[in-house]
């Protein structure tokens, strides 16, 4: 699977601060997006508050096909902060591709891959270096 972010303006930036969890509703949304975009990939940016991923940012002009997805970083709103990306692998393989590794290094600290069958067991999180990271699933009130 090929995933890439096109270079954009410097005003859109990855936010610092340790991400340790993902909101259950946000995870459910990412999985549902995978189902609805199947057999194509999708890619979005992720936002967080107090270390919990709880925002999904679809970016205008971004897209995906059966073996690739991309984000148009020059379309990210000025001043918007994000902590990473999420994208789907319709074939169900929730491991980073070679292209994913370069995207991870350029676009934040946490990257989520969801895969078919898009259930609570078919996703993984990775750090900038492509190594798996553990995210707690929490319910925000």
Walk through the language-model features, giving the residues of each:
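Conserved beta-strand-loop surface patch within small alpha/beta domains used
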Residues: 1-82, 91-141
């Amino acid at each position: 699977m090929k995933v890439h972010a096109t270079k954009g303006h410097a005003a859109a930036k990855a936010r610092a601060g340790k991400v340790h969890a993902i909101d259950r509703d946000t995870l459910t949304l990412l999985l549902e997006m995978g189902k609805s975009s199947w057999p194509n990939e999708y890619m979005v940016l992720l936002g967080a508050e107090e270390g919990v991923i709880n925002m999904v940012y679809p970016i205008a002009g971004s897209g995906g096909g059966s073996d690739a997805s991309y984000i148009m970083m020059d379309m990210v709103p000025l001043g918007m902060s994000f902590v990473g990306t999420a994208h789907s692998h319709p074939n169900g393989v929730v491991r980073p591709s070679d292209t994913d590794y370069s995207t991870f290094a350029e676009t934040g600290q946490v990257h989520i891959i969801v895969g078919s069958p898009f259930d609570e067991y078919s996703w993984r999180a990775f750090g900038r270096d492509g190594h798996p990271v553990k995210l707690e699933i929490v319910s925000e009130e």
